[in-house]
């Protein structure tokens, strides 16, 4: 009997032990499952929606400017300025200014430093050990990375220039499996503001901020033809290179006080002949220019030699946009600079690129509604662009007596486009209307009024009998429509 009790006791003990082990294993599995299903994000914001960051001990002036811009961007998104704070979730490092101790700490993070450390203007953004790590190879690279954070938060690089308001957000985060490694393929990327009203002292800083957000690093002058006297203090603080006569000057060294001059052999100058403004280029035409060797120039070309280099290498040249008004060319500039960084930026096609840009500006739902407007706008301007509608190009080939009055049909298409544009404008929230006007409505209505002004004037000239214009009601009616379009065009430009 005693043996039975002993055996029963041992059996009960084993059962209890097995039950405890089973419970322990189950608990472990539950914890593991909970860990796996938990949202793997690194949050930029605290419980109040405030963004904070830390930096290494020494940073360059352009990085400080970028941080100030970032602070304002975060206020626009979350309602609070981004602040520097010990132990913050965002850690920012400028590689060429790190102390030995700081560099050792960065190495331990396991970030792919070898991919950016020897490249100019490159940067890395990714998550490491529960923090969002931002590393720039130099001053510009670090500043560009900070501006990339603003872009990831929903602030367009063109926001300040096109009155685009970012969507409000209570929290910001980055998934742990996401990272960005960006290295420019074109070393010198920039613009030449020739004979421009924008080259005034009060605009220097504004232009430099646009270049910072677009990740452009060069202001261009060629052979004294351009009268832009760039402000040295602004250029230096934003770490901008200045190029003249195919030689570019930039500051180098850890203290950033040594000047280095470099000769550039191949330069792609877009709209350098002033025949067409940068703002008039469609995405397709701009892409063709950037991909064609026919737009390459070199220093040798100035001495009568071929402007195309047999040893051309895209990664070894400069891309410069010749513009007179950057405010009207921001979309084209952004596209050009994206391609200067990433040759696959338009791999999915121009249509997809435009759609993604509109989505970023206005949201996916509104962007999808706007896309057909832009498609029709580019189709109509590809038939006859506004830049080639007026003198000195003479009358257009549009004919009112052939092909079912193609002149009136062309203008009718613009009337339909204007009506659709206004219909969408009425549905927009108030905070998107200014941005919509600048990005969508203004270029569409500008092209429509120019076409109406020029083509109706052409119609009046063609149908009026010599010496009898005052008695020709049809000709006078066409002339009146042309004058009305001219007045509307003046009002549109004044409002813009």
Give the role of each language-model region.
Residues 23-183:
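Contiguous, structured surface segment used for ligand recognition
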Residues 9-18:
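Bacterial N-terminal signal peptides
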Residues 66, 70, 142-145, 204-207, ...:
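Stable alpha-helical elements in mature extracytoplasmic
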């Amino acid at each position: 009997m005693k043996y039975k009790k002993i055996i029963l006791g041992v059996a009960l003990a084993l059962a209890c032990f097995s039950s405890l082990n089973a419970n322990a294993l189950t608990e472990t599995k539950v914890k593991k499952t909970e860990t796996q299903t938990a949202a793997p994000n690194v949050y930029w914001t605290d419980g109040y929606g405030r963004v904070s960051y830390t930096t290494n001990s020494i940073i360059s002036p352009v990085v400080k400017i970028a941080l100030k811009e970032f602070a304002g961007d975060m206020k626009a998104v979350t309602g609070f300025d981004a602040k520097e704070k010990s132990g913050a979730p965002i850690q920012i490092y400028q590689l060429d200014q790190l102390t030995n101790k700081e560099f050792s700490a960065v190495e331990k993070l396991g970030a792919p430093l070898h991919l950016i450390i020897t490249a100019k203007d490159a940067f890395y953004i990714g998550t490491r050990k529960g923090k969002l790590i931002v590393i720039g190879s130099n001053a510009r690279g670090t500043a560009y990375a900070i501006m990339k954070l603003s872009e990831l938060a929903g602030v367009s690089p063109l926001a300040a220039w096109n009155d685009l308001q970012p969507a409000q957000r209570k929290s910001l985060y980055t998934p742990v499996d996401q990272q960005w490694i960006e290295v420019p393929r074109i070393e010198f990327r920039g613009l030449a503001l020739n004979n421009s009203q924008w080259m005034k002292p009060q605009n220097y800083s504004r232009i430099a901020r646009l270049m910072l957000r677009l990740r452009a690093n060069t202001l261009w002058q060629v052979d004294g033809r351009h009268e832009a006297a760039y402000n040295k203090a602004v250029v230096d603080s934003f770490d901008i290179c200045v190029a003249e006569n195919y030689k570019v000057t930039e500051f180098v060294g850890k203290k950033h006080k040594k000047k280095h001059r470099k000769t550039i052999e191949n330069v792609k100058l877009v709209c350098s002949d002033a025949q067409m403004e940068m703002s008039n280029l469609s995405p397709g035409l701009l892409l063709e220019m950037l991909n064609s060797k026919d737009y390459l120039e070199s220093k040798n070309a100035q001495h009568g030699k071929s402007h195309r280099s047999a040893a051309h290498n895209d990664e070894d040249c400069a891309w410069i946009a010749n513009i007179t008004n950057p405010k009207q060319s921001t979309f084209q500039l952004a596209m050009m600079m994206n391609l200067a960084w990433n040759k696959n930026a338009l791999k999915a096609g121009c249509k997809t690129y435009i759609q993604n840009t509109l989505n970023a500006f206005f949201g996916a739902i509104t962007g999808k509604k706007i896309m057909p407007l832009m498609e029709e706008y580019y189709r109509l301007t590809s038939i006859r662009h506004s830049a080639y509608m007026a003198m000195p190009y003479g009358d257009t080939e549009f004919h009112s007596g052939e092909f079912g009055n193609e002149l009136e049909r062309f203008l009718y298409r613009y009337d339909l486009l204007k009506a659709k544009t206004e219909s969408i404008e009425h549905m927009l929230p108030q905070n998107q209307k200014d941005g919509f006007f600048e990005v969508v409505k203004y270029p569409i209505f500008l092209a429509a009024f120019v076409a109406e002004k020029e083509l109706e004037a052409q119609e009046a000239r063609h149908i009026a009998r010599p010496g009898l214009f005052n008695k020709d009601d049809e000709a006078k009616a066409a002339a009146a429509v042309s004058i009305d379009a001219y007045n509307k065009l003046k009002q549109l430009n004044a409002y813009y």
